[in-house]
Amino acid sequence: MKRSIVFIYSLVILLLSVGFIDAFKISIENHIKLSDDSSYQIGTGIYDITGPGAETNMMGYAMPGQITGGIHFRQRARAFVFIDSEGNRAVYVSTDSCMIFQEVKIQVIQDLQEIFGPTLYTHDNVLLSGTHTHSGPAGFSEYALYGITALGFYKKNFDTICDGIVQAIVKAHKSVQPARMLTQQGELWNSNINRSPYAYDNNPEEEKAMYDANVDKNMTVIRIEDMSGNPFAAISFFGVHCTSMNNTNHLISGDNKGYASYLWEKHANGQSSLPGTGPFIAAFGQSNEGDVSPNTRGPTCRDGKPCDYKTSTCNGKVEECWALGPGTDGDMFESTQIIGGNQFNKALELFNNATIQVSGKIQYRHTWKPFTNVSVEAPYNSGVEGATTCRGAMGYSFAGGTTDGPGAFNFIQGDNSTTNPFWNFIGGIIAKPTPQQTACQAPKPILIDVGMVEPIPWVPDVMPLQIITLGQIVLVAVPGEFTTMSGRRLRNTVREIIGQSIENPIVLIAGLANTYSGYIATFEEFQVQRYEGASTVFGPHTLGAYQQEFANLAQSIVDGSQADPGTFPRNMSGHTPFFLPPVIVDVAPKFDDFGDIYTDVSTTTPYSINQTVTVIFYGANLRNNFMTESSFLTVDQLQSNGQWTTILNDGDWDTKLYWKMHDLGFSLITVDWTISPITQPGTYRITHSGYAKKNPFSDNLTFYQGISSNFNVQ
C-alpha cells in the first residue's frame, strides 16, 4: 500500500510540475473539594504551535501554489482545564489551526498519559477544536486526501502542533484555581454571510421561517473569573470561516479568530505585553461554519457583475467569482481586522454583561463510530426507508472550491460534469465507484472515491463523537464542518434529549474537533451538490447519522449510563511519505554573513505614525527552526538607561516577516513594522534571528542574529 501511495504522490508531483497544476511526572492531586455546584477549579494555558514559515503548502484552500513565505502573526493553542466539586474534569482546547486531525488527537492523548498516567486525560474528556484558519502550514495528517497538495506528511510540523497542544494543557493543569463561570449570549451582525444560499434555500420553507437569517448570528461567551470576581479567561463561540485571508496569502496567520484572540489578550494584559505570555487568555472557538463566510460584501465577478446564483460562476468560470471582505477594495488584511475586531468587540460586550451563572456537574461521553455503513432510522432518515451512510466519496463540486477561494481547476458548483483531465485521471486511478457506491451517494457525481481505496481510505472513516457538559453548557464536538442548518438541527436534537436532566441547557457546536471528515450538509442541501454537499463525505444521510448517534450519547448522560467506547481507528503512523526535499544548505553572499543587512532602515529621516519601516537581512531557511515560543524578529526601543526593551515580535499584528529565496540561492528576510498610533516617540531598532544550516553533510544548525541601524520615530 505504501508503494502505491508513493506512486500516486509521485504522479501528482509530476502532473503539477508540468502545469496541472517536560518529560517529568506532575502530581495529579491538584484539586480541592468545592462547596457548591457553581464553584469549579479552572486552569488555562497557551503555547506556540507555529509551523514552517517557508516552502510549505498551506492547509485549507488546497492550492498547490499557496506556499508559506513568512509570518504575519503566530498561531497558538489555548487550553482550559475544568474541574467540578466532585473532581470530574474536562479539557477544551482551541487551536489556531485549520482543523484537528485524528492523528493529532491520538498523539496528544498518548503524550498526556505519559505525563499524567492513563486515566486523568483521555479521549473521553479532552476536546480539541481548530479555528479553521486557512493560513497555516499543511502536512499534519497522514490521510492522503489532506496531504496531496502538501506533498505528504510533514512530521516536524505535526510534532510542533501536538507538542504545543500538550504544553498548553500542562500549563492549564498546573494553574488550576478556584473559579466560577458566567455566560451570556447575543447577536453579532455584519460579520458573516451564507456563501451557498442556493443550497440553504433548498431546506424546508417552514424550517427556514423559524430563523431570522440564513446564518447563525448568535454568539455565546463564557466568562471565567476567580472567586473574587477577577476575570482571567474567556471563551467565545461564533460560526464563521477563517477565510478573511484569501488563497493569495503566503504569510502564516491566525486569521480573524486569531486576531480577535490577539486583540483581547492585548486589551486585558496591557498593550506592552508580548503575545502568548498571558495571564489572560481568550479563545474564539469555532462552531458550525460550514457554509458561513466572513467575506461580507459577497461574491462578485471581476467585472463587477453578480456571480451566477446557482453555480457561483462568471461566464461559466469559477475562478472569476470571488467574495470580498469588508476591507477597502476587499483588502484581506483589513478584512481580517474588521471581522476579528467585530468578534472581539461583541465578545467583550457580552463578557462585561455576563449574568447567567454556570452551575452543575462536568460530564462527558465519547464513542468511536465507524461511519461508512450506519443505518439511519426515523426520525433522522429524512423519510427514507433503509437509509444508510456510505463509504467516503468527494463530488465534482468539491474541486470547484468556494467563493472564498475558487478551485484551481474549472469545476462548477452544482454541475455534475467536467472535462478537466487532471481530476478525471486522479479519480480514475484511485478507485472506480461501484454501482452500489454510486447509488448510495446519489445524486452526488463521484469525482474521487476516497473511501474505496484499499487497504487504507484517503479520509478517516471512524468518527470520534463527544459531548462535554460544563454545568448547563453542553459542548457537542463535531469532527467536521456542519452547515448552518445542519448545526441547528443537531443542537435541537441534543437539546431536546439532554434537557431532560439539565435545566435550560446551552448547546454549542465545537467545530472541526478531534478529527476531520469534511462537511456535513443537510439532506436537502446535499441534493443540489454545491461545494458543501459535494464535500459531505458519507453521503446524503450523513447529518441524520450524526443526529442519531449524538442523540444516543445525550441519552446516556440523561440515563447516567456509560457510552459504548466503539471501535478505535486504525494506526496511521508511517503510512504516508513526505516529498518536500529537506533544506540541504544555507548560503550567504561571498562578502556577507547570515544576519548582515541587505537593505537598511532610514537613519536620517524620522518615521511617523502609520508609516512602515522596512529592513532586509541576509538570512536562512525558516524551515530549519520554527523558533517555537520565541521569535524571528523583534522591534526594540532604547530606554533612558541605555538598555533595549522588546516591544513587538513576530506574534504581533503590526509586524510582518517575509522569506524569499534569491536567484543566487541565498535567503532574504524582509521585516516590515507598521507604526501604530500608540507607539511612543523614541529610538528603535529591528532584529532578525534564525538558524542556518551551513554544512550540507551535517544536520547541525548555527544561530545567527542581525540588527538594523538605529532609527527614530517622531
From Swiss-Prot:
Query: Which leading EC class covers this enzyme?
Result: hydrolase
Q: What else is known?
A: In contrast to other members of the family, it displays a highest activity at acidic and not neutral pH.
Q: What is its EC number?
A: 3.5.1.23
Q: Where is the active site?
A: 293 (nucleophile)
Put simply, this protein is called Neutral ceramidase A
Please give the InterPro entries that the UniProt record associates with this protein: Ceramidase_alk, NCDase_C_sf, NEUT/ALK_ceramidase_C, NEUT/ALK_ceramidase_N
Q: Which gene encodes it?
A: dcd2A
Q: Organism classification, top ranks?
A: Eukaryota, Amoebozoa, Evosea, Eumycetozoa, Dictyostelia
A single GO BP: ceramide catabolic process
Pfam families, from UniProt?
A: Ceramidase_alk, Ceramidse_alk_C
Glycosylation: which residues?
Answer: 218, 246, 353, 373, 416, 571, 610, 700
Q: Which reaction does it catalyse?
A: an N-acylsphing-4-enine + H2O = sphing-4-enine + a fatty acid
Q: What are the entry keywords?
A: Glycoprotein, Hydrolase, Lipid metabolism, Secreted, Signal, Sphingolipid metabolism
pH effect summary: Optimum pH is 3.0.
The portions of this protein that span the membrane are none
**Which cellular component, as a GO term, is one annotated location?**
extracellular region
